[in-house]
Amino acid sequence: VPPLICGGQSKYDIEDSLIDMDFLGLHNVLALRGDKRQNEPRFVPYAQGHAHAADLVRQIQAMNRGEFIDGEVEECHHSKFSVGVAGYPEKHFGAANPQSDLQYLKEKVDAGADYIVTQMFFDNSKYFDFVERCRKAGITVPIIPGIKPISTPKHLEILPRTFSVSLPEELVKAVRACGEDTQAAR
């Protein structure tokens, strides 16, 4: 599933990419806001671009109805995109709290997301708790768990810092016990 991000492109660029993807028969897309630029304190949308993934989902769903940015409606051309969005079992690092993070996820689903792919997690209880919170919030689309194997002891440092995820102590101990044997760590 190709990711499509808001950052670094305008709505017109996104529409062009979607037209190309549709022409090529790529009908699944993962709609993401994308990360902030390296030297910026927060995400800044591209000129005439989207600030949020929910806006990108709305644009994709409009194309599915044959509605294009210039206001034209092409009755003969309706795309058939299935749209996935990101969900965060441990909360998006930029969210004020888990409740606001869940509200934003619901906005993406209400905008037309067909499924959710979660950020990686290493404690299954966090995933199951997340699914339960989603269902209680009225989010009923499929929730696909994001999986990332730990293939090197360096991941014990890099993954939590980079992706704001936690690692269970039991897993940390098991990987550290493997030393530099990356095959055993896998």
Regions found by a protein language model. Give the residues of each.
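Flexible, glycine-rich active-site loops centered on histidine and acidic residues
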Residues: 10-58
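Conserved, mostly hydrophobic/aromatic
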Residues: 21, 108, 112, 145
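Active-site pocket-lining/capping segments in soluble small-molecule metabolic enzymes
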Residues: 34, 47-80, 85-94, 136-186
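Active-site glycine-rich loop that binds ribose-phosphate moieties when present
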Residues: 94-111
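Catalytic beta/alpha-barrel core
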Residues: 30-32, 114-123, 186
